Amino acid sequence: LAETSATSGGLDSLLEPHGPIKEAQELASRAFGSKQTFFATNGTSTCNKIVVQALVRPGDIVLVDRDCHKSHHYGMVLAGAEVVYLDSYPLNEYSMYGAVPLREIKHQLLALKAAGKLDRVRMLLLTNCTFDGLVYNEAWFAFARFSPTYRQRTAMRTANDLRKRLRTEDHARAYKAQQKELETASDEDWLDARLIAPPAARVRVYATQSTHKTLTSLRQGSMIHVNDQDFKGEVEQSFHEAYMTHTSTSPNYQIIASLDVGRRQVELEGFEFVQRQIEAAMSMRRAIASHPLLKKYFKVLAAGDMIPEHHRQSGVSSYFDVEQGWTDMFECWEQDDFVLDPTRVTLAVGGTGWDGDTFKNDVLMDKYGIQINKTS
C-alpha cells in the first residue's frame, strides 16, 4: 500500500483529482469555509511555496513578517519577489517577538507609495497563529474553525464576512465619508485611522494549514484554503502549475486519506475537542498559579504580558483568574487587535535562574526526558 499510485488504476490522482480525492477536497472546502481546498502531502512548507509561486511574479513586492517560516523565503526566491520585511513589536523582557501591528503595515505601504512603488505590491504574508499563540484577526490554527469564539479570527471566515460587508450600502456610505475626511490628511492621520476598504475591493485570501500539527492527520498532511474572487480568471492556471511543480507524482495515499479522516472528525466532534482543549489549558494554568512552590518560580504569561495595552481595546489582561475562573473571551476576540490563543501555554522560567534553552536541555530533557517544542 505504501507504493500505491494513480497509474495502478482504481485510485484517484492528487495532481488531477476526479474521484474520491476530488470529493474529499470539496468536503474539506465546505468544512473550512473556503471556495477551493487543495491537499498536500509534504507539509505546509510546500503549501507556502505553491501559493507564493502562483501569485507572485518577478519584481513584485511582498510584505512579510520578519519572523515568518523559512519556506516563505525560499518561495519568494523562486518567484523572484522583492521583499519588504515587517517588524513585530518586541517583548524584550521575555526575549520574544509579538505580532505585526496594522500601523507597521500602513507605514511600509506609505513608504512604498512615496517611492512610486505601491502598484507593485502583490501580497501581504502573515503567520496566524504564532507559535506563542498570538492571533491576528492559520498554519497552526486549523482547529479554530470549529469554535464560535476562534472562528471569527480565521482567514476564511474573515474573507466571507468582508465580501458580504463590501456589498452593503452602509459600507459604501462609510467609505465615501471617510475618503472625504482624508482628502487633506497627513501620513500620520492615515496611520492612525481605521481605514475602510473601497466597495470595489477584491477579496483575495489564501490560508495554508498544517493539519498534521493541529488536527488529526499523518505527518506532512496539509491543506491550502483559497477564498479568492479572482482565482478562476487570474490565478487558476499558475496555481496548478505551481502545484504540479511541488507535488510528487507518487504521493502517499495514506497521508491523503488521513486528511479526509481529520476533516470528518472535526466536523463531527471538533467543537467538543476544542472546548476540552481550552479547559485542559486553563486547568494547567490554575495548577501552576495555585501551587505554592511552582508559582514562586514559574509564571504562565497572559494576554497582558504578551500584547501591549493599546492593542487590547477590551482592557482585559487575562482570560483566566485563579479565584474567579474564565473571563468573557468572546468580547476580547471581537474587539482587540491581537488576542492570545489560550491553548498555547507560554511559561516564563526566569524565576528559576535559568534561561529557556538551559532549562529545556539541562533540566527537562537530560534529567527528566521531557521534550519542549520551543524556547527563547
Write out the residue ranges for each language-model feature.
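Short active-site oxyanion
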Residues: 35-37, 59-62
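Conserved C-terminal alpha-helix-loop-beta "cap" of PLP-dependent enzymes
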Residues: 278-376
